[in-house]
Regions:
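Short aromatic-glycine motifs in intrinsically disordered, low-complexity regions
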Residues: 9-19
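Polybasic, low-complexity association/targeting segments
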Residues: 1-7
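A conserved, well-ordered hydrophobic junction motif at loop->secondary-structure transitions
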Residues: 41-75
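Conserved positions in beta-strands of structured domains
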Residues: 26-29, 91, 96, 110-112
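HotDog/MaoC-like acyl-thioester-processing domains
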Residues: 37, 69, 100-102, 106, ...
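Hydrophobic beta-strand-centered segment that forms part of the acyl-chain substrate-binding groove
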Residues: 5, 69-106
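Catalytic strand-loop segment that frames the active site of acyl-thioester-processing enzymes
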Residues: 19-55
Length: 142
């Protein structure tokens, strides 16, 4: 069964403020009031790829941009441009392994709480059925 797609490719630029070469999300599968699901195909041209693998900072940035894509979709529905978000804290983030180029990642974003321009999200990144990374990220929206 094919998964629903809300935005992909260039459409993502309506949802996140990042631009190449710093774009770490290439598809938004779903978004609702509690979270969303994004994807990234790891490309050898990715700035975080080293020796055929997406380095740890790339996985963290992908998770943060996944949260940004979810938030950006809400802004898009309200007729607004995406807002800039800054990583305020990375908490309990675990990386089981780094993915190889060509792997297709899917990341679930669950909003734990929001207040005064700050969002606390829990992310889980999968390659197929294997959870390869995840944790909590605090993001400040400016």
């Amino acid at each position: 069964m094919t998964e629903q797609v809300l935005a992909r490719g260039e459409e993502i630029f309506r949802l996140i403020p990042q631009r190449p070469p710093m774009v770490m999300v290439d598809v938004l599968y779903s978004a609702d009031e509690t979270g969303g699901r994004t994807g990234l195909t790891v490309s050898p041209a990715n700035v975080f790829c080293i020796n055929g693998f997406l380095a740890e900072p790339g996985l963290i940035e992908h998770s943060a941009q996944s949260a940004a894509a979810f938030a950006g979709y809400r802004y898009f529905l309200a007729g607004e441009d995406p807002h800039v978000g800054l990583i305020g804290e990375i908490k309990t983030f675990r990386i089981a392994r780094t993915p190889k180029t060509g792997e297709k990642l899917k990341t679930n974003v669950n909003v734990i709480g929001e207040a005064m321009g700050m969002s606390l999200v829990e992310t889980e990144t999968f390659s197929g059925d294997e959870k390869i990374a995840g944790g909590q990220i605090k993001i400040f929206i400016v």
